[in-house]
Amino acid sequence: MLEHAYRRRFRQGLSVRSFMLARLQRLYPLYALAFILSLPFLLGQLAAGAPDRAQTILGLLCSALMLPTPDPAHLDADLYPFNFAAWSLFFEVAANLLFAALGKRLDTKSVICLVGGFALALVVCATMGWLGFGIEADKRGVLGGGPTWETFGAGVIRVGFSFFAGVLVYRFYETARLPAARPGFAISAFALVTAILALDFPSSLDLALSLFSVIVVFPLAITICARFDPPRGAFANMMQTLGLLSYGIYVLQVVTFHAVEACARHLEVQSALVGLVAIPVVAAVAYAATVFVDVPVRLTMKQALKGLA
C-alpha cells in the first residue's frame, strides 16, 4: 500500500518529515481512541491498588504517546501492556521510517537485498532460537515474537521481512503485468492461507513448514489475490468495507474484547460463545470508529499539521 501511494511522491521530493506526519495522521486517531476507551479499565487497576503504581502510570504516559513502556525489571513484559496489539504498530512505524529514509534510493535491487537479508535472518534466528524466537512458541507459534521485551529482536526481523516483502510483491505486481487471476485461483489461495493459519503442523515439521509458508506461500498467495478483480456488486462492496475496517478492527480488538468480557462477567455468562459474540461487536465498533472518529479526526489533523510538513 505504501509503495503504491508514496513511491512516485518520494521521487518528486517528498520529505521524511512529511511522510511520517502522514503516517501519524493515519495511525494515531484510532490508536488514541483505543487508549481512551481503555482508560476505565486502567484507572480501575490503579484504584484497586495496582501492584506497581509507578510502572502503571509510566505505562499510561508511554501509551498515550504511542511509545512502548520500558520495564527493565520484567523482560517478559509487553511493549504495550494496555493494548497488546500495538506492538506491531511500533515496528511498522520504524519500518516506515527506514522506508522513508531510503526514499527514491530504494530501487528494486535494494528491496531484493533487504528481503533476502531479513529472510535469511528469519531462518537462522528461528532455527537457532536467537533474538527471542521460540520463547513464546506455545502461545504464538514457532515464529512468534515481538510483543515483549525479551522477544524484541524477533519482532524486528518479522516486521522487517514482511514490510519489505510487501514492497517487493507490489513491484512485481506492477512490472510483471500478469493476467487477472480467475476467481478459483484467488479463492484457492485464500483458502490455503486460512488453512495454514488454522491448522497445527506436526511438531517435527512445524518450524520448516512455518518458514516455508511465511517466505514462499504467503507472498505468492498475496500476489495471486492482488490480481483478482472482484465483479462489481455486493462482493466487491464487502471487500472494500473489510479493507476500510481492517486497521480499526486490529487496533480496537483488545479493548473491545475486554469490554465484552466485563459485560459477560457482570451478567454471569460463562460460555465459549462470548468470544463469538465479540467478533461482530469488534467489527461494529471498528465501523463506527472509522466513520465517525477516524475520518473526521484525520482531516482535522491534516489541516493542523499542514505547516509542519
Model-derived regions, located:
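Hydrophobic alpha-helical transmembrane segments
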Residues: M20, Y28, F90, V111-G116, ...
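Membrane-helix interface segments
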Residues: R11-V16, T56-I57, D107-C113, L178-G184, ...
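Structural signal for the C-terminal ends of transmembrane alpha-helices
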Residues: L2-F10, P40-G44, A101-T108, V167-R177, ...
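Solvent-exposed interhelical
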Residues: V93-W130, Y170-A186
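Alpha-helical transmembrane segments of multi-pass integral membrane proteins
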Residues: V123, G155, F163, F190-P296
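Function-critical hydrophobic alpha-helical transmembrane segments in multi-pass membrane proteins
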Residues: D78-G103, G155, V159-F164
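Membrane-interface helix-loop-helix regions
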Residues: E3-A5, G13, R17, L21, ...
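Transmembrane alpha-helical segments and their boundary/interface "anchor" motifs
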Residues: R7-G44, A54-S63, A95-N96, A154, ...
